[in-house]
């Protein structure tokens, strides 16, 4: 993600966290059938996965495998009519489970072929399946809903979710915007494949993740079908729609590139769009193979949003991007999208990597070297008294997770590590990191372990200074 200001203040408090943890504890208490110890032990899935920054996010008891989302949307009325079919596998015997959903009114909900009881409690959609679900059972949840999806406003006044534009909608999801329009298990750790079937007035273009399977027009309405074949976290899903100029090309190595640009931004965006193939080729040479079956970008006019987001396969931009911003968001396809955080406090692994990738791209194209950028007044050249040095890189807190520290100090950490272990070990490390955790999740602890393994060095003191301590590092 790139932004002109810090995003996403805390949405939690001690009471909320305690309540979530208590509910999770209660949910794990199950009773066996009397006199039959081998019988299923039905219980409610946990209503939270316990992330310290966003304790309401995610749910336990099942693993989502696929989302199939069918919807119609009219930009004139801002009304969505949608049906989402979730395919999941129960990871425990379930008599109740939660989904995350803040969207429009639900008109129908089924588990399998059977209507299910449900209630809404804030973000939680609490479902009681009939019959109950056994461990290992594959099941579907079909949710039908209609109305206007909400814009989610964070305490820092940045917005996400379903953001109407003058010709459609801009749809960013990080860190908790997907439930505005998508009933889901909204956690970075529960990745799934996606299919989107979107019907809009003729002349409107819908751009989703993955590849365009079909586009058909009849009776003044056009249906777009997008398929995302590789696993994706919900916050990376998008179905941004509006008036776009579409261009399709390929990189020299054959990666399909699909770009959709608001015609009002074509001239300002031309330089960044033209460099997409070159950026992808360069990053593939140092990070390893591009992890998806399509690349691209969506450049829209959404002035109230004010940031770009690394939506999987096609980053979304709320204004015309610079080449550097384009490089940052494309780097996320490896670091952030394919390899995602284990918990939100690990955000430096996303933003630090993408920022450092931009330093490498700048050097590659004849600009400042990575060392010069490290030394600059925006980075290590900041005064030791700057408040910048008072945020912990590996635990910035929800109020600073999209501030400068995970980005800039995260990138500085990587450059300092490169100097510590040498170029050969460093570039082996970051390529192995992308390969070993492809389509998965990883933590700061995982990265430290990987760095020590590749380098053969004890790096505890190094990472303590750069990741876990406040203050400007003086030596490492």
Predicted regions, residues:
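N-terminal, polar/Ser/Thr-rich
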Residues: 2-17, 27-81, 164-167
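Short, hydrophobic/aromatic-enriched beta-strand segments in well-ordered soluble domains
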Residues: 84-86, 137-151, 194-202, 224-230
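A surface-exposed beta-strand-loop module
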Residues: 101-163
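Glycine/proline-rich low-complexity spacer/linker segments in large multi-domain proteins
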Residues: 135, 145-194
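Hydrophobic helix-coil surface modules that form long, contiguous segments used
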Residues: 187-327
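Zinc-dependent metallopeptidase catalytic helix centered on the HExxH motif
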Residues: 313-373
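Amphipathic alpha-helical substructures
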Residues: 403-476
